[in-house]
Amino acid sequence: MSEFTLEPLYDYPQREQVLALARTHADAVDRGERSPFENLREIAKDGLITLGRDGGSLVPQVSVAFDLATEDASTAFSLWAHRSTIAFFDAVGRELPAGLADATVSGTTAMAAAYKEASGLAPIKVEGTLVEGGLKLNGSVSWASNLYPGGVIVLPVAVQNAPESHPNRYIVTVRQDVEGLSIDYHRNLLALNGTESGTLKFEDVFVPSEDVLSDNIEAFLHDVTAPFLLVQSSFCLGLAAGALQEAAKHLDVSQGVFRPEFPLILAEYQSLREELVRLASEPARAERRDLLSLRLGVSHFATIATHFELQVVGGAGYV
């Protein structure tokens, strides 16, 4: 008998339709026969990919990502990258490029390098050179997702020839099919096969001045970290919740050898769930340390939960 009930983070009116949509198309998305953006366009009709843009609670938005992840990891992951891109434009008070709000144009976040450099882990690998009317980009981004033709990409750039005492780190936006940008797509990805992920290579890509979103990378990261990490955390927690739901159906296999572990795992799940809702309720007041701690915690927990599911469900073959 199941000892785990998958409760919503927030019971929005369209929840059952979202779950049914993800469940129905999960296999086709994973096989590459259906784009996650077909799902996102469906839920965008009800405004479910632009929740919380007013700076208030992000609980409804993280709830949608959580629910998608319990059924379809690729669509939930694509929502995170797309919603983060929307947050980047909101953070600098820019109007959204046409198509982002209804997912007819994809949004790609290539911001990992900015966070790595801010943490002292690695430098930004895309370099910019100031030229008349803008700058030219050269370098690479090792991983980005939602790489569809015409898509909107946001990334950090290390400017090499900035005047002394001027900012030398920019946040810029480019289109996926801009001249000089090539993509090496990653295929056969575990759980994320439908996300159109790949490596970006920039060769003299011109960015006009109006496509520089910010030259204050510290302030920019401060403003976008909450939506960026909270939606990402909800994706991880939803993936874990889906694994626990499946494992709970098989706790009596192999003479119930795995059953004693389950209450401990559930306690950790409940703790992370409560912290996610707490931080998402007032994202503007969330401390960076708490956001990072949650993100690391749910990532680790997703590994534990999926491994537990593999043990328990796999054990059914030995009954």
Regions found by a protein language model. Give the residues of each.
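Alpha-helical interface subdomain recognition
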Residues: 2-63, 233-319
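Glycine-rich flavin
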Residues: 34-140, 145
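Short loop segments at secondary-structure junctions
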Residues: 92-94, 131-132, 158-162, 176-179, ...
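A generic structural signal for well-ordered coil/turn residues at beta-strand boundaries
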Residues: 105, 122-124, 149-151, 168, ...
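Short glycine/serine/proline-enriched coil/turn segments at secondary-structure junctions
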Residues: 116-119, 144-147, 163-164, 191-193
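A generic structural signal for beta-strand entry/edge sites
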Residues: 132-136, 152, 197
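A short core secondary-structure module
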Residues: 140-181
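Glycine-rich beta->alpha junctions and the first turn(s) of the following alpha-helix
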Residues: 187-270
